[in-house]
Amino acid sequence: MSTLGNSTVKPTNAEFPGLHAMERYKPATSESLYVKGHYGPHPHKEHPAAYVAAKTGFNATSRRQSVREHHSSHEGSAQLNPDRILYMSAGAVTAAVPNKEHTDNVTTSQTIRYETSSQPSQEVYHPHAGKAAQSAHVMNSTESRPSSAHVSSSYTQKPFAFPLGPVFATSSQAAASETALPSGYEPDEARFIGASQLAKLSASHAHQTPAQTVDDDVPLPTRMAATELVGHIPLRAANYANEYSQDVPASTHRAASELVHGVPMRASGINDPKHDLDAATRHNINSVAAASYVAARSRVIEEEEEPPNEVKERMDYEADAQRRIRKMNVFGSAGAALRERTQQDLMANEQEHSGEFAGFSRNLTNTAAAPTTYEYKRPTSSYTAKDATSKVYRSNTYKPKSSVNGSVYRSKSVKSTTSHNKVPERNSVPAYNEKLMHSSAANAAILSHKNYSPPVQPTRDDEVSQEDARVKEIVRGMKLPLTSSSLSAAAYRPMEKQDPATVERHHIQAEATQRVRDMKLDLTKLESKTNDEIRSYRPRNVVIKPYAAATPPKNIPSTYRAPQAPSVLSPVVTASEGDFELDGITPERQQTMTRSTYQESSQRPFHEDPFRTHPGLLQAVARNHRNSLANIDERIMRQNQAATANTNTVSETDIEALERRLSKAYRMEAQEEAYAINIGGGRVISPEELEEIARRNVDPMVSELSERAAQERERKEQAKEAKRLKKLAKEEKRLKKKEEKARKAEEKRLQKERAKYAKQMSRESAHADQAIANTGPVAPPYFEHETEPSHYEEEEEEEPEERREESSHFSESSGNNEFEETEQEYTHGYGNDVLVQRTDVVNNFGESSHAHDNAVNEKRDLGRNGFGDVDEQDATEVYRHSIERIVPGDYLHDEKTRDTLTRESPAFRSEEAVVEVADEDHPHASEAERAHSYSNRKQASSESSPESQSTHYNDYEGTEDNIVRQTTTVDEDGHQEQTTSTTKVAHPIPVSNGLSSPPRERLDDNAKEILSRSSPKSPVAWFKRKFKNRKDKAAVKRMLEEDSSKQLSSGRDVVAPTSVNHDVSHVGESTKPAVNNSTKPVAVTSKNGHSRNGSHAAHSNNVIGTQPHVNVSAVPNTGNLKDALEGSAVSKTDDVDNVVSGHSNVNGVSKSRPNIVERSEDYVISHLPEQSRAPIGAAFQEDL
């Protein structure tokens, strides 16, 4: 324990569990804080071997087989053996004997009975026995006395007999006082005081030991260092001191190894065989004497009993402890001097050497065994230089378990009131491994007394036989060469249950598995690979060689006489000499002792019992053990006399050097203990090495998993992108389909509207022509806006025969509900050929095909019998105009059809055309009426022109108030004479010639099929296919009503349309005009700015001027018309019919442009936008 200044730090339960626990009492006053350590003021300073003597009893003895077998069932696999605690408790109860009743705090007290010879010889006692007894006495002086319930009443009560004379046979010191016990005290107190005085007297004369015969080089500081190492590294000194404590000399490690194992690691020839038996005998006897006293003062509490009153018990403990401590003189001046010196050094070197001095004085005596079972945990705290007294090592945390089998040692703690002497908390600084601290004076003495009873007058053979048997079991129990953790486990468990598979590999596999489990990897694969790495790992310990001492550091030469220096002693070695014998052991006994009851021969590095295969090894071990303590103590005393004048004190220099070396050794050992992992077979591995092994196996796996994960992510991204693109394409297709559907619906709607409007216009035109025929010319309406001309798609495929029949039947039965045909033709003006859209109404759609054919035949016959002297070119021109009137523009755009019709058209007389037109205009007239009409027309024609002339009228557009009529008269000789007449009308419109069809017999089959109303190629069938859906009639009517209301609100006059035709019938005769049309002007301009008839675009102003119903702002902006026609829209439509036109159409060749062949793609047909406020069809809303 640490003693700094004038106060003492009380050890905690973590430092002194079990028999040595200081928590069993709590002094009520600060006066009790002056209780010094268990062994007084540093007993190792006054004589170090006295401290060691009480510690090493267990190492020289063995437990009885019956006790091992009895408690083998209580074995723990990886923890401290509960059997160990039970065994110590049993030894304490057995060693204690009843005594007379005490008057303090117990009803029945005990004293110690120890049987020995009535006249003990001086040779029996070891010089260290007194100091050992004093140490044991001080350890138990502050503990309560045992309860009478744990002591058998059959024991006789006798006082403990301490020798009162000189303890050395050859000592020059006078004999001590023969006074029995101090007077004036109670019997127990007198006995305590007498034992203490005797122990101090024996220790004071220990330096007068006779001169030794064996020389050694182990000085006193080295022996102190060995004692210190034993206290803190009990079973690790030989294994780890050489490797992790470089500043401690090899002699210190060797001495520590001897103290730890009880077997000097030296060749047997170094020691003198004469001292073997005597030294061992004295040592064992005196250890038993000291242990008997310690066991008598032990207190065992059964768990089944009712717990005592802790308050009253504590008060009794405090009062009794204070009274006894005040009466005992156990504190020396040397201890106070050392405490003061250590305190000064710590304060002076707090920053620089705090780590070196930390924990030295405090932990010198912290070597008590731990009867409480602890559970190992991983380190939780680390070393800190600023707080050297509280955080010196990387600590191991232990968790106390419950009591085992009902027997525990009750402990109580005392808290210090001084701040600088505060004991660190349990979890922060256990300065040693409690799991390994099992070689203390109390438990060692108990086991020694339990297992060894010296005979009254033993013989050499008996002693050697018993000693050899004990040493053999001890060495076998060490399981060398193993690391400290396995050694400590072996010491705390019966040998029958030691299984290296659970002891050695359990911890390494558990830690490795837990670490790898945190990585979330494949544990099965990783564990197998890790096990392979561990098996092939080269252990840290070198190959063991026979009879070798501890290996010194490589940078420090060995001062010992050992030729080889491994770190551990191995019982597998082969004896160098073959003449050793097992003294006093029969082969049967040897076989019994060497039999192993656990099955691990195939799993350990050595497979046979070393004492069975090499009998000489047992003798060497026994002899070296007997020589160990006595020879070491003699050498120390001899060298100490020459080194110091006062042998009771140690130089301050030696103490400082020892503190520095041991502090560093403790830190290194604690760090190694915290980090070293035992992998079995005497091998340890650091966490860094284990991590490297694990990473070597894990990294390829992790890399592969990462690569696979990256590939999988890329694949998912690609799949996602493909899915997105597919969805986008699908959406685009859906939108396109929707747009196409909307476009077709809009086109269909426009076609319906155009068809209905055309029908309405035809009806109104028919009424207007009738009015003109009856009453004369009427001013046409004035339109400010235009409608978009009709556009016909390409000719559809021929319908099947069923569809043809259906179309024929439909044309016969539909009557006036049919749509009229619409065509485009050129109206010839002054300077331009303006493409106008004309609606020709065939009013006889309701007739049957048979009636129609009859009418056509009649017209054809009339044409044959009429005027036959008409020029063929004139007839061709007349036929062309007839075709333009009947066949839609789509048919005329077909060059093959147009050329066929034009080329094969015969000449016929204009009278036939007039008669045919008249017949067509009156489909329901009787034969008499038609004949009368024809005769009237013929007569008028004869009167107006001679027979040798044929008159052809061309109506040109004039000014806003005039219609210019140009008449071309062709003589018999072919000369043409043109006359122009101007007729003033209100609002003229362009008119084109309308003549009847040529005779059918002169047409080819294609033309006949086109002209036949029943043919699918006829305009009637074409209109039927184009305008099947007539459901928008109400919508058109509603639209026309709205447009009419707008125009009426604007104050415009609604005038019926008018038309000028070639009818030469009598004025007043009620006949329909030959041509019923309604024109919609659309400008046709060549792409280079020239108009259709070859004149410059400047003439277009005249055209616009003669178009009263055309809004100037709606004229397309093409060519050089930009200034005059601002804001118009231009669009390119289908190819324009390139029918040749000119001022005179009789010969089919234009006189203005006779040599120019025109192409339809050179012209742009501009559909004039509807920008006027005047609606379409507003003039006809009354008729709807």
UniProtKB/Swiss-Prot annotation:
Name of the featured protein: Uncharacterized protein C63.14
Modified residues (Phosphoserine): 686, 905, 1018
Polar residues bias locations: 137-152, 397-421, 1073-1107
One Pfam entry name: Eisosome1
One GO term (biological process): eisosome assembly
GO annotations of cellular component type: cytosol; eisosome
Upper lineage: Eukaryota, Fungi, Dikarya, Ascomycota, Taphrinomycotina
InterPro entries: Eisosome1
Primary residence: cytoplasm
Region (Disordered) location: 115-152, 397-426, 705-870, 890-1017, 1029-1107, 1135-1154
Domain of life: Eukaryota
Record's compositionally biased regions (Low complexity): 941-950, 1138-1150
Composition bias type Basic and acidic residues, residue spans: 705-767, 783-792, 849-863, 891-902, 920-932, 999-1011, 1032-1045
Organism per entry: Schizosaccharomyces pombe (strain 972 / ATCC 24843) (Fission yeast)
PANTHER family documented for this protein: EISOSOME PROTEIN 1 (PTHR28298:SF1)
Compartment(s) where it occurs, according to its Swiss-Prot or TrEMBL record: Cytoplasm
Keywords assigned by UniProt, alphabetized: Cytoplasm, Phosphoprotein
